[in-house]
């Protein structure tokens, strides 16, 4: 049996958590951590953020991000090592709708309320 890919295991663990800290980077390299909801999407992860947010602007110029399991308030446990990743953004309506459905299935009512705000 082939050995499990540790990246896949990390992706599964992150996708199963309630929140991850998504850290994007300003042009000057300064990190900007934000707790976000996350859902597994094949061998990657998907998150949602409204159009025009700082996260999207930063990902647009610097796709390098780090992700780590965190609390709702964004606290990362001392023993958690952030995972380096590459983020992409989409505004394709079909893709946004598909990811929104995945998040709604995982988070239920709290996600639906979030989408109303």
Language-model regions: role of each:
Residues 6-9, 32-34, 52, 116:
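A generic local structural motif
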